[in-house]
Amino acid sequence: MKAYLILEDGSVYEGENVGACREAVSEIVFNTSMTGYLEVMTDPSYAGQAVVMTYPLIGNYGICYDDMESYRPWIDGLIVRELSEVASNFRNEDSIQNFLIKNNIPCICGIDTRDLTKRLREHGTMNGFITVDSSFVVEKILQRIKEYSVKDVVKRTSTKEAYILPGKGKRVVLIDFGAKKNIARQLQKRGCEVIVVPCDTKAKEILKLKPDGIMLSNGPGDPKENVDIIKEIKKLYDTDIPIFAICLGHQLMALATGANTYKLRYGHRGGNHPVKDLETGRTYISSQNHGYAVDESTLDKNICVPAFVNVNDGTNEGLRYINKKIFTVQYHPEACPGPRDSSYLFDKFIKMMED
């Protein structure tokens, strides 16, 4: 069956439908990872977005459910050059096509993803419409496509109830803004007791749990939407509790301390982004998934200073807070998918809680 992707600039891509037979309007973004498509599909940070995989062959190692980064996939759609009909992997439990259909996710294959990615790079991230209905009239659906925006996705992806992951070491409260599983896994691996709480948990309730440290997780959407959450984070900043923040959490902490954020032209999504540690001069290859960044020109240097920078485009990738046990990074040290070069940051957080 034919499937179509119509972008808000009026361009149309034709391919084959290999997923669920439904329409979807979404923000179209691209990911440059060669592997890790299941982790991408189940990363809550992609809520409200359809993902173009730039690597030309997807699905060749199937689906292993243990690799999921959430209890369900969050993408609105998947766009690939070629979907493998054969999965060769001793861990394989399902085909990617079955996974997409079971989870009602549309997928287009057979389109020129190089051309599509080039268009998104040149013109910036765009909204798009995925459909199997060939009777569409571009002029009639453009307004609907342009009006779409990613809204209210943090509450949708966050846990609704607090829960505890046992450990005998330090107690860490993980505020779930759409947290990937591997964040908690990395903390448990280091012996921590992890208490995962909903995104809208009040600071006073978090303090009642007597945490040794607090983690602000990754998550989807525009950080500025989360006005009430930002107010609670400011209250946590005013304590002496060690705080480690990742991705959206990094942006929220920056906003809570008076800085600004802005939308990137086409974002950073993939497992091959170089970031430079400004203190040591060392460069790490990182896993990234964000469409917004902290504006360094708005930082109060009496509060925080840049700690990491993106080697490719010079955007901020981390902050160090003055006279506070707080550090934040824009990228994903927990990886999954991607390199584990920066997993040492979890060790740094543990040491910070012990000091």
Which residue stretches match the model-derived regions?
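Catalytic beta-strand/loop cores that center a nucleophilic Ser/Cys/Thr
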Residues: R282-K324
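Active-site-proximal beta-strand elements of phosphoester/diester hydrolases
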Residues: R171-D176, S286-S287, F327-Y331
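Short clusters of small/polar residues that mark proteolytic maturation junctions
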Residues: N17-V18, Y55, Q288, V311, ...
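A glycine-centered loop/beta-turn motif at secondary-structure junctions
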Residues: G318-D355
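Cysteine-nucleophile active-site neighborhood
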Residues: G213, S217-I285, A293, G338-M353
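Active-site glycine-centered loops adjacent to acidic/histidine catalytic or metal-binding residues
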Residues: D112, C247, H290, H332
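Proline-centered loop/turn at the N-terminus of a beta-strand
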Residues: P106, R171, P242-F244, N260, ...
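RNA-binding accessory domains that recognize and position tRNA/RNA substrates
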Residues: M1-K204, K208-L209, P223, C336, ...
